[in-house]
Regions:
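Short acidic-glycine loop/turn motifs at beta-strand connectors
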Residues: 43-46, 100, 125-130, 159-160, ...
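Bacterial N-terminal signal peptides
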Residues: 9-18
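Active-site-adjacent helix-turn-beta-strand microarchitecture at beta-sheet edges
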Residues: 92-167
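Zymogen propeptides
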Residues: 21-115
């Protein structure tokens, strides 16, 4: 009888651990207005969200599948991955990039054309207090000390409102696959990718209306990619620069 109870207790413990692990990275697919959207919520107290760019040999990973294989060679399993901001032709980050506490690319405050330079642009970061999104100017005025950070643009939502960036025009007809990120609380990060083309304005509305995010950052469009086995996503498209990843 005692042995049977031990087995039952062990089985319950295994189930509880499995449930906790499953919820640490929780992805779901839903329809927002007329567009299907996939979102993945990372519980940062239970999972270590990292930024990746180059492998141990100094070569850009380029593909989420290459990151997965590299981690597998280290005895780790990639459970979530997504492109993490805009990049140059050589796959180097266009703006600030910090991984493992090391700044590999500085904050980019230049003016230019393209979505990255649409004001306001911003930074997603992870530090001792958790996750947050802030504008580039806020970061420059009071530099934090993140263990990981990536810069992109434009900001989709700022202080609880869709930003006034010209690309956020509600009447815009520019439709693309898009992805972005927000931190609804310091201990959670939510990554979103549209499964079909939509406008900037509609994408920003999802973060504001569905997720209740006060600040959200656009990551990229067209090349947007997701690795999330729990919802059957292992996107392979164009080569990528910086990437987010969760590994166990």
């Amino acid at each position: 009888m005692a042995r049977r109870l031990t087995r039952i207790t062990w089985a319950v413990a295994v189930l509880l651990l499995a449930a906790g692990a499953a919820q640490a990275v929780e992805c779901k697919v839903q329809t927002f207005e007329t567009v299907q959207v996939t979102s993945c919520r990372i519980a940062l107290r239970r999972e270590s969200l990292q930024l990746y760019w180059r492998d141990q040999g100094g070569k850009p990973y380029g593909r989420l599948s290459h990151l997965k294989d590299s981690l597998a060679n280290q005895g780790k399993t990639l459970t979530f991955g997504m492109n993490a901001g805009m990049y140059e032709e050589d796959l180097s980050p266009l703006g600030l990039f910090i991984a493992d506490g090391r700044e590999l690319r500085p904050l980019n405050r230049r003016s230019g054309s393209g979505n990255f330079y649409q004001p306001p642009n911003g930074v997603f970061l992870l530090d001792d207090t958790g996750a947050r999104v802030m504008t580039t100017e806020e970061y420059a005025d009071s530099p934090p000390h993140p263990r990981a950070a990536t810069q992109s643009g434009p900001m989709l939502v700022l202080q609880g409102a869709i930003t006034g960036s010209p690309v956020m025009d509600a009447k815009s007809t520019s439709m693309k696959i898009r992805n972005g990120v927000c931190a609804p609380s310091p201990d959670a990060a939510v990554f979103v990718i549209s499964d079909s083309p939509l406008t900037f304005y509609m994408f920003a509305k999802f973060f504001l209306d569905e997720l209740g995010c006060r600040d959200a950052l656009y990551l990229d469009g067209s090349i947007s990619s997701l690795y999330a086995p729990q919802v059957g996503r292992q996107d392979e498209g164009r080569d990528l620069g910086p990437m987010f990843g969760v590994a166990q």
